[in-house]
Amino acid sequence: MTDGTPVTKNLEENEVWFRSRCEGCSDIKLQPMRLGKDGSVSALAIYVENTVPNLILEESVLGRMFIDMAGKDPKEVYQAVEANSLGLSEAQPLQTREEGMNAMLAGNLLLLVEGYDKGLKIGSKGYPARSVDNTDTEKVLRGSNEGFTESVKTNTALIRKRIRSTDMKVEELTAGVRSNTRLVLVYMKELVYPEVLEQIRRGIDQFVIDGVLDSGIIEQLTEEDWVSPFPQFQTTERPDLAAMEVLDGRVVLLCDNSPVALLLPSVFQDFMNVTEDRYNRFEIASFERVIRYAAMIFSFLLSGTYLAVIGFHTMILPTNLILSFAESRQGVPFPSLLEVLFMELAFELIREAGIRMPGALSGTIGIVGGLIIGDAAVSANLVSPMAVVIVALSALSSFAIPNEECTSAFRLIKYGFILLGGLLGMYGLSLIHISEPTRH
């Protein structure tokens, strides 16, 4: 038997219970009405404002209910409700008041009828949601332009649209003691590893939190190594990529109110792949993948290597290149380490400003800001032209990494390479590579 307070046949008791818990919630409406012959049966409709359209309340569900039950006696009314004589596709009887409350707060219409010991959940449009649109974070030249929205129902439908097979299972979970956020696991029953699926379920069930408002909260609470700056779950806003990974035997975790899906389990190379790799020829996709891996290495290693070479190991460079470096640094009052750190932090400010600026200006601030700051710093002899080139190449390389969370991790560890490369040379860079923190 379901835990909770059962719905009773006494409508007044049910109404008092719901009104006491909805006190102070002006957006929750409790609408009394009369059904049956001569209005002999009392009923109560409970819903959240703007989640149930007027069409449902006046012309569709309740309107049809008034017409269908106008000449029926109380017993016939109960039988009609029990048998769902209106043919509502999403009508479901609920045993307890808590189930009814959760269903109503999820955006459904809850109907209580005098003499009927169950609540009737009637599906509606739910909460207002953004329509399906392009994704700004994972742009591609070839492939679908659809992106996930904040509605888990819509996101599930976008995946089902691409995998029209009953072997694709959609499993619902709930997270958040107060938020009661709906989670969905999407997987192919014949392809997924049962051990992986069970581990994901345990990871979700093991934490207790008031509210889950985004998939990023689940990502942080379920990751195994919280010390590492690198992401342990691949994320995507593209339903075509999610469908591809489901067909590969992975599990897609969707979170209500979040357009970002988690792809489980994940390995490092997943973060370097893009959707277009599946659509392009093997030779082209392989070449582009090599470029991305090279950009990944440059993004965190280039600046530190530059400092190590010009500060400690100039003998490995040709004489002409050494002279060029020395000439570019004439008149610069700061050591190479400080000028590189200055430019790196300046680029971080430009990047952050570009993200926070309005859309019409965000694209301009990065280009114009970089040109102005770089040219002004060189003209004022604060930094050398070579340092600007190195830092710009490092920043450009980071933009080529497909996964933003992975990019942020490389941007963070880059400063460790800069400090050790500038202070200890190649020995410092080697120290980072051979060191591995051990957790006990």
Roles of regions detected by a PLM:
Residues 1-301, 315, 319, 435, ...:
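Membrane-embedded alpha-helical signal segments
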Residues 164, 205, 351, 378, ...:
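Short polybasic/polar patches that bind polyanions
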Residues 253, 260, 266-417:
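Transmembrane alpha-helical segments that form the functional core of multipass membrane systems
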Residues 373, 433-434:
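Aromatic/hydrophobic pocket-lining residues that form π-stacking "cages" and hydrophobic walls in ligand
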Residues 379-385, 422-430:
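Transmembrane helix interruption/hinge and helix-loop junction motifs
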